[in-house]
Amino acid sequence: VVTMAGGQGTRLGHTGPKGTFKLDVYGKGKYLFEILIENLKEANKKYDTVIPWYIMTSKENNKETTDFLEKNNYFGYDRDHVTIFMQSELPLVDTEGKLLISKELKIKEASDGNGGTYSSLRASGCLADMKEKGIKWVFIGGVDNCLVKMVDPVLMGVAIDKQVTVACKSVVKANPKEKVGVFCKRNGKPNVIEYTEITDEMAESTDENGELLYGESHILCNLFSVGAIERMGANPL
């Protein structure tokens, strides 16, 4: 399991890393990391194993995330099966495509986002570690989805049955204006278009049955074969 946890909790009204945000769960405060760990521990018990967990942080929040998990003793998860790695960074540009320069006359950089996960897994040695452990399938999701089912044999079974190397879960959009990325085809290939990029006309388009043409939302629940991660990590996205 790979959890993308490089972001800050700004949009949640939280000053720290997203994973350190606390929710009210049945009257009890629980951190996002804590909830995910509980789900992993349940899967470990069900399948009589200990699932290797890879947490992707960023240069911005790596220390704070690591300190938080250490302080809380990884909420009881076996530390030997947790690997923390940092995602890469890319140069920042303005709206005209010009590089942004800091006061120290250095090129400003920021984390390269979800698309950099694959190359970061490769560069950090995590991909090699997965192969050494004999791992065949990897679930990749975001730290802020507390309802995610990180270990889903049905999703894996569908991928194997359909002979595909990538499988994604989707939820139908509540309405055309819902702020979620949606699945589409670009040049005949599966793709995701973000809500910030889709036009109103596209968002509101329907088929002959009145269903949204772009109604399958991308909820960041993705399953990859190790081979697929290796291929994508070797090619710039």
Tell where the protein language model's regions lie, with residue ranges.
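Domain-scale recognition of functional cores that engage charged ligands
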Residues: V1-T3, T10-L237
